[in-house]
Amino acid sequence: MAKLHDYYKDEVVAKLMTEFNYNSVMQVPRVEKITLNMGVGEAIADKKLLDNAAADLTAISGQKPLITKARKSVAGFKIRQGYPIGCKVTLRGERMWEFFERLITIAVPRIRDFRGLSAKSFDGRGNYSMGVREQIIFPEIDYDKVDRVRGLDITITTTAKSDEEGRALLAAFDFPFRK
């Protein structure tokens, strides 16, 4: 079992119960899933780029990504409906906790010129989204084998009812928010 999951059960739940005066342990917000999304618009011209992006996402998450396809045709971007334009992975359970731990302890501190993550990136329902400009911050990616530096979106979906609860949940995990 991931250390962060044990930490959540033992300490975070108790801390949030007293902070928000919950009656039941089931009211305490928890991390439900983490979604990693990599948009590869250049895949229209070269299909190999999408394969490389999918391989990177597989290395980062430990799970095979789903290839996302264009929902509708856009002439300005030269894409047609059904063209593969990206890939995504949804992590839940044990893999999610292991990824979350690696994200907080290893990957985020390796971001260049890092001054903390914005606390304004909540969606109004306690879910947090962040963008990473380089996939090479993850130790699973071999810098020498990278064909192109590409970014990815990371969305942390929680059961929190408000941004305040979501922020308190992530702050309890020592999530590096900007002061």
UniProtKB/Swiss-Prot annotation:
Q: Quick one: a GO cellular component term?
A: ribonucleoprotein complex
Q: Which InterPro entries match?
A: Ribosomal_uL5, Ribosomal_uL5_bac-type, Ribosomal_uL5_C, Ribosomal_uL5_CS, Ribosomal_uL5_dom_sf, Ribosomal_uL5_N
Task: Kindly list the biological process annotations in GO that this record carries.
Answer: translation
Keyword annotations from UniProtKB, A to Z? Ribonucleoprotein, Ribosomal protein, RNA-binding, rRNA-binding, tRNA-binding
Q: Does the keyword Transit peptide apply?
A: no
* Xref: Pfam families: Ribosomal_L5, Ribosomal_L5_C
Q: Which PANTHER family match?
A: 60S RIBOSOMAL PROTEIN L11-RELATED
Per UniProt, subunit arrangement is:
Part of the 50S ribosomal subunit; part of the 5S rRNA/L5/L18/L25 subcomplex. Contacts the 5S rRNA and the P site tRNA. Forms a bridge to the 30S subunit in the 70S ribosome.
User: What family is reported?
Assistant: Belongs to the universal ribosomal protein uL5 family.
Protein name (Swiss-Prot/TrEMBL): Large ribosomal subunit protein uL5
Q: Which organism is it from?
A: Klebsiella pneumoniae (strain 342)
